[in-house]
Amino acid sequence: MAAHIAQRLTVQEQEIRRLNEEIGRLLELGLQGSVEHSPNPVLEQLRAENEKLKYRISHLQRSLREEQERARPGQYGEPGLKDAAPVEEPKQQNNKAKEKGQATKGENSVGGKPSACEGNKKNEKKAGKEVDGHKQEGPCAPGFIKDRLALYETLKNEHDALLAARAAHQSKPIKITLADGKQVDGESWKTTPYQVAIGISKGLADNVVIAKVNNELWDLDRPLEQDSNVELLKFDSEEAQAVYWHSSAHILGETMENFYGGCLCYGPPIENGFYYDMYLDGRGVSSNEFPSLENMCKAIIKEKQPFERLEVSKDLLLEMFKYNKFKCRILNEKVDTPTTTVYRCGPLIDLCRGPHVRHTGKIKTLKIYKNSSTYWEGRADMETLQRIYGISFPDSKLMKEWEQFQEEAKNRDHRKIGRDQELFFFHDLSPGSCFFLPRGAHIYNTLTDFIKGEYQIRNFTEVASPNIYNSKLWEMSGHWQHYSENMFSFEVEKETFALKPMNCPGHCLMFGHRPRSWRELPLRFADFGVLHRNELSGTLSGLTRVRRFQQDDAHIFCTMDQIQEEMNGCLQFLQSVYKVFGFTFQLHLSTRPENYLGEIEIWNEAEKQLESSLNQFGEPWKLNPGDGAFYGPKIDIKIKDAIGRYHQCATIQLDFQLPIRFNLTYVSKDGDDKKRPVIIHRAILGSVERMIAILCENYGGKWPFWLSPRQVMVIPVGPSCDEYAQQVCKDVFEAGFMAEVDLDHSCTLNKKIRNAQLAQCNFILVVGEKEKTDSAVNVRTRDNKVHGEILLTSAIEKLKTLKKLRSKNAEEEF
């Protein structure tokens, strides 16, 4: 190998000499004078090739040195095993390493396989060795860390010198306006938000997570550059939480890099916490490793490593991260600017927009609680990554509350409730497709009937459309270009067909199958058709992520003048439905994404209409820039459940694109037959399956009476009352209720009542000889409230009234 590299090196050096001679020849021909003002293309190309070859030579020289080092006789009588020589450690520690499958004789730290970044990894570091003054606690410290830090330090010194020069020569007085309107004086390129916070109070400065400068999140130690409006955000701000958890992800990334030695990928904050993905080349992550990872994180926190921001050119970053193909992909595919930013904490340097907390010591308590496998960017044809999840807080009290919340959420898990209450199940022979049992089907049908009843009130027309379409339909709609990977497709008679993942193109065919008049608009099509989406098997999760589902899907075809009224109607519709469930909600306006279809003027008009509707609705709303669908802006609605979690279900989308793609027209009042309608995509429940999961967990299996799968349990006092109990059950069932009768003679009366209460039966009707004689029932609830004896006919009428009203507390109101 060394001989091969040396041979390549000789060839490259000869090529450079040839290029230098050619450059000299061109310069002698008189081109030198024109280079400064109008460079000769041939000369410039030769120079570029020259620079590339110099870089290759540098790389080959480094590779040659490393190959020669590896070629030296190994310590175990085998050539080339220098890197694999075991680290000398106390015997006890070495045994622990063996137990955990860490680096031992002839192996590295990743289960005996080459490290994910082995091609750029130098001698495996001894546990506890320092790199640039930072102690590496893990079983390995990859060699690329040292090279990465060396380049970073050079660039950081240049950056600091530039910043010092700006502070010395460009600084000027600035006005800093605080959130309360108060103004303080500062100096550009010198005054930082942290200094502003200190000027107010030390307590404030200690509790501030991040600053917001002129509506942009800003590092606390980053100097202000001009007159600024400054907000100081604490952890109770959602934006501050995202920053806090993002910084925590970097701590986890530093730990994973040193512990596993793999290639870091993405490490973002999420709704509750953070995660980091790492490529480990086939090696997995074990929960047994969590304590070691947490201890390393605690050590990093204790060091109070500062977060440093540095803007670097893309070319230099490709050099800095050459050991990591994933970071290079991000740079090549995602970064379209000449420069971007990296952040450093300790030995970790990572591509990152930031901002971050001041130092790692701001993370007071951190817990690693879960791991999973995923694909690079969610694509099944790409590399498998290992993902580790964590959570962190600024005090231990919040961590304790979070742990209690997790326990409560675990008890409310819809998969557990579905199993315990016999609502539904899944099977490997149809992954991602739910089997709803009778009780689950009752919930499903009750929800759809609820929405259908609202359709009658709000003048929606229910339709039914095909499940399978020729791919030409999806090409026409634009979905084939943007969404075909998520569709189930197949060949029929040499034509490609696909199961529909949404209803809108079919509804466009229904609108356009005959001429339409302005008198028909608005035309509101509603459809509960079955939809299929080819979700990756690794992402399937109970009812929240499925392949087969139904939506309360509707599309409103209207004129431009009708948009405002229709949008208001949609918002009022969702408000009335969520009120029944007891949900509060948040509204988010999602605007034009990068991959949008259509003209920007149409997008601007659509966004303006949605904003106007939201303002008129009167509820608070937030802007979510760039998160709209590719065919139009939308309003996303997030509901809040009983334990404080948010879920996105409803959506309202304005679409100017599909009417154009399907050439939909109507005849206007003045006779113009080329007028284009507007489409409003609308769903309230969203996926019925997902809504059932949310309701399961929201109610904790304690269903409200109108929706409950076990509304009435009839219990006879003794065998002599069995026949009457069965008749009562039959009458209640025929009146439209989910009714059962307990005829188990092995249980006492009290045991039967207790079983019914534990099964969350809303009402328990006890019948004995007296009730049998009087055609009555003795009513009690699952919460053991006794309503006493009442005629069966009266009881059924009361139950009907409570069901019709969809009462939240029917048991109390009976």
UniProtKB/Swiss-Prot annotation:
<dbReference type="GO" id="GO:0006435">
    <property type="term" value="P:threonyl-tRNA aminoacylation"/>
</dbReference>
<keyword id="KW-0030">Aminoacyl-tRNA synthetase</keyword>
<comment type="function">
    <text>Catalyzes the attachment of threonine to tRNA(Thr) in a two-step reaction: threonine is first activated by ATP to form Thr-AMP and then transferred to the acceptor end of tRNA(Thr). Also edits incorrectly charged tRNA(Thr) via its editing domain, at the post-transfer stage.</text>
</comment>
<feature type="region of interest" description="Disordered">
    <location>
        <begin position="62"/>
        <end position="142"/>
    </location>
</feature>
<dbReference type="GO" id="GO:0005634">
    <property type="term" value="C:nucleus"/>
</dbReference>
<feature type="short sequence motif" description="Nuclear localization signal">
    <location>
        <begin position="798"/>
        <end position="804"/>
    </location>
</feature>
<dbReference type="InterPro" id="IPR006195">
    <property type="entry name" value="aa-tRNA-synth_II"/>
</dbReference>
<dbReference type="InterPro" id="IPR018163">
    <property type="entry name" value="Thr/Ala-tRNA-synth_IIc_edit"/>
</dbReference>
<dbReference type="InterPro" id="IPR012676">
    <property type="entry name" value="TGS-like"/>
</dbReference>
<dbReference type="InterPro" id="IPR045864">
    <property type="entry name" value="aa-tRNA-synth_II/BPL/LPL"/>
</dbReference>
<feature type="compositionally biased region" description="Basic and acidic residues">
    <location>
        <begin position="88"/>
        <end position="102"/>
    </location>
</feature>
<dbReference type="Pfam" id="PF02824">
    <property type="entry name" value="TGS"/>
</dbReference>
<dbReference type="Pfam" id="PF00587">
    <property type="entry name" value="tRNA-synt_2b"/>
</dbReference>
<feature type="coiled-coil region">
    <location>
        <begin position="2"/>
        <end position="72"/>
    </location>
</feature>
<keyword id="KW-0963">Cytoplasm</keyword>
<keyword id="KW-0547">Nucleotide-binding</keyword>
<keyword id="KW-0648">Protein biosynthesis</keyword>
<keyword id="KW-0436">Ligase</keyword>
<keyword id="KW-0539">Nucleus</keyword>
<feature type="compositionally biased region" description="Basic and acidic residues">
    <location>
        <begin position="119"/>
        <end position="137"/>
    </location>
</feature>
<dbReference type="InterPro" id="IPR012947">
    <property type="entry name" value="tRNA_SAD"/>
</dbReference>
<dbReference type="Pfam" id="PF03129">
    <property type="entry name" value="HGTP_anticodon"/>
</dbReference>
<dbReference type="GO" id="GO:0004829">
    <property type="term" value="F:threonine-tRNA ligase activity"/>
</dbReference>
<dbReference type="InterPro" id="IPR012675">
    <property type="entry name" value="Beta-grasp_dom_sf"/>
</dbReference>
<dbReference type="Pfam" id="PF07973">
    <property type="entry name" value="tRNA_SAD"/>
</dbReference>
<dbReference type="InterPro" id="IPR002314">
    <property type="entry name" value="aa-tRNA-synt_IIb"/>
</dbReference>
<comment type="similarity">
    <text>Belongs to the class-II aminoacyl-tRNA synthetase family.</text>
</comment>
<dbReference type="GO" id="GO:0005737">
    <property type="term" value="C:cytoplasm"/>
</dbReference>
<keyword id="KW-0175">Coiled coil</keyword>
<dbReference type="InterPro" id="IPR033728">
    <property type="entry name" value="ThrRS_core"/>
</dbReference>
<protein>
    <recommendedName>
        <fullName>Threonine--tRNA ligase 2, cytoplasmic</fullName>
        <ecNumber>6.1.1.3</ecNumber>
    </recommendedName>
</protein>
<feature type="domain" description="TGS">
    <location>
        <begin position="172"/>
        <end position="234"/>
    </location>
</feature>
<dbReference type="GO" id="GO:0005524">
    <property type="term" value="F:ATP binding"/>
</dbReference>
<dbReference type="InterPro" id="IPR002320">
    <property type="entry name" value="Thr-tRNA-ligase_IIa"/>
</dbReference>
<keyword id="KW-0067">ATP-binding</keyword>
<feature type="compositionally biased region" description="Basic and acidic residues">
    <location>
        <begin position="63"/>
        <end position="72"/>
    </location>
</feature>
<dbReference type="InterPro" id="IPR004095">
    <property type="entry name" value="TGS"/>
</dbReference>
<dbReference type="InterPro" id="IPR047246">
    <property type="entry name" value="ThrRS_anticodon"/>
</dbReference>
<dbReference type="InterPro" id="IPR036621">
    <property type="entry name" value="Anticodon-bd_dom_sf"/>
</dbReference>
<dbReference type="InterPro" id="IPR004154">
    <property type="entry name" value="Anticodon-bd"/>
</dbReference>
